[in-house]
A protein has these predicted regions:
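Active-site core segments that coordinate phosphate-bearing ligands/cofactors
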Residues: 2-5, 12, 117-129, 139-160, ...
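Short, basic and Ser/Thr-rich N-terminal targeting/leader segments
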Residues: 6, 16-18, 75-77, 82-84, ...
């Protein structure tokens, strides 16, 4: 690909809903050798009925990961930070953190969204290109303004979670394009904040910070942090700070038109476009035009993902039954009957006290075995993927031949094969560390002249194995389609 005088060492901070990790990537001019140097679990903390993120725990863990990366590599050329979307923290006028950030799984967003008329919801979509969702920052902010007026009143700056972490490391306040688009306060047509939406919901636009471009240097690591960790200062680079955008940057596609599923806590199902699709069809099908790498658009839908399976596993552990993920898959495969079908995006599954009980309730089968619950969950997820894929084809007018599944969930071969069987499309799984690879790829743009998106994807193909899954010709296509129609008509 390119000749380098020496390898480039990039550190990717990849923060998900259940863990955060520090990944060291060493690019030799052709491929990136990646190593997870530290991974730490984290969860929300419930206080007085609200769920918070322990952002200081995350920050401290990332510092320790940076130290470990330096010890292993000997030098660090740059850092990039990406996390989940929609959540944020407040700073006062002096730049001090006012409170731990609230989690999107709180009910305050739902209460605000439900108060809007159909006309208002369509107006917000037309202004931003983003679907109305209870988790969006817009509705969280509106809820906080009513629930916590004192906190909202003294907040001078609002930073999205990845930009807040970048601020901790550099002291620079900014907003990145892809994460800004998840707020539903950003106009993806003009690539600017949606001033009309700020005015309509009485949210001060001055709380939001200027935008930076991908590959741009945000600032240098604070000298005080470098001294504490006993490492040299290095630049922090503006990467797509929404983890989905980083993952899509690392989709190993060679074709221009492709489908992707970024599979993790959520399943983000979509395609990459050059311009947004803000139409009646997109609105009715509940798609979002989110910001992607280098000002592309990811037309996608947030759908339930591994969170459901993680909660099932947690419920089993609380009942004294511990299973590995391989054992979870075998339990699903052992079920010989017809799986029950349910909508994985049902509100009842958003944050239930017990996921297994909630699924049994949706299936109207209180005595369903754990094997049936798991088989039904996997099948319902795959049918949801099929439905979303068909909707993407309808709104874009394109017929896609392949689906690329990236992220941690791409390692689930059982679900990958189900997806191929139930959609009738070729599936390619991997890379598992797509978010980190995309993060590192965009960092390389700041180091290598002319390095772009096609180079990032070539680097990914050179770096990680990609596994193909083809529709099983032995499966009864007619039965698959009949069950799918039943599933579709019951939604």
């Amino acid at each position: 690909m390119t000749s380098l005088p020496k390898p480039i060492n990039c550190v990717a901070f990849d923060c998900g809903n259940s863990s955060f990790r520090t990944v060291l990537g060493t690019f030799d001019g052709t491929r990136t050798n990646m190593e997870v140097v530290l991974q730490v679990s984290h969860n929300t903390i419930e206080i007085n009925g609200l769920y918070y993120w322990d952002i200081l725990h995350v920050y401290e863990g990332l510092k320790q990961g940076l130290k470990e990366a330096f010890l292993r590599a000997g030098h660090i050329d740059s850092i990039g930070i990406c996390t989940w979307g929609v959540d944020f923290g407040f700073l006062d006028e002096n730049g001090f953190l006012l409170a731990n950030p609230l989690c999107y799984r709180n009910p305050i967003g739902e209460e605000q969204l439900s108060g809007l008329s159909a006309e208002e919801k369509r107006w917000v979509f037309d202004k931003t290109g983003i679907q109305n969702n209870r988790i969006n920052s817009l509705y969280q902010l509106t809820g906080i303004k009513g629930l916590m007026p004192d906190l909202f009143g003294i907040a001078s700056h609002m930073l999205m979670i990845p930009d807040l972490l970048s601020y901790f490391f550099t002291g620079e306040k900014f907003t990145e394009f892809s994460i800004a688009s998840t707020t539903q306060l950003f106009d993806v047509k003009s690539m600017q904040y949606a001033e009309d939406v700020f005015d309509r919901f009485a949210i001060p636009m001055k709380m939001f910070k200027p935008l930076k471009q991908h590959g741009e240097v945000i600032g240098m690591l604070k000298q005080s942090i470098a001294d504490e960790l006993r490492i040299p200062v290095c630049p922090v680079i503006c990467v797509p700070s929404h983890d989905t955008a980083c993952a899509v940057a690392a989709v190993p596609a060679m074709e221009e038109d492709f489908l992707f599923i970024s599979s993790g806590t959520w399943s983000l199902i979509g395609t990459e476009l050059q311009t947004p699709e803000i139409t009646q069809e997109v609105y009715q099908r509940d798609f979002a035009n989110e910001g992607g790498v280098f000002n592309t658009i990811t037309l996608l839908k947030n759908s339930a993902g591994m969170h459901i399976l993680q909660c099932i596993r947690r419920d089993l552990e609380l009942d004294g039954k511990k299973f590995t993920w391989d054992e979870i898959v075998r339990l699903a495969q052992n079920y010989q009957g017809a799986p029950g079908l349910f909508d994985p995006n049902s509100y009842e599954l958003f944050n239930p006290k017990n996921m297994i009980s909630a699924i049994r309730g949706l299936m109207k089968d209180d005595n369903a075995t754990i094997e049936k619950v798991l088989a039904s969950t996997y099948t319902s997820l795959a049918y949801t993927y099929r439905r979303t894929v068909e909707q993407i084809q309808e709104v874009t007018g394109k017929d896609y031949s392949s689906i690329y599944i990236v992220g941690g969930g791409s390692q689930n071969a059982y679900l990958n094969q189900l997806t191929a069987d139930l959609t009738g499309k070729k599936v390619f799984s991997g890379p598992k560390e797509a978010t980190s690879l995309g993060n590192i790829g965009v960092q390389l743009v700041s180091h290598i002249s002319g390095f772009g998106l096609s180079d990032i994807r070539e680097m990914v193909r050179n770096s990680e194995p990609i596994s193909p899954f083809h529709p099983d010709p032995q499966r009864d296509r007619q039965l698959i389609d009949v069950r799918y129609r039943d599933f579709y008509e019951n939604q």
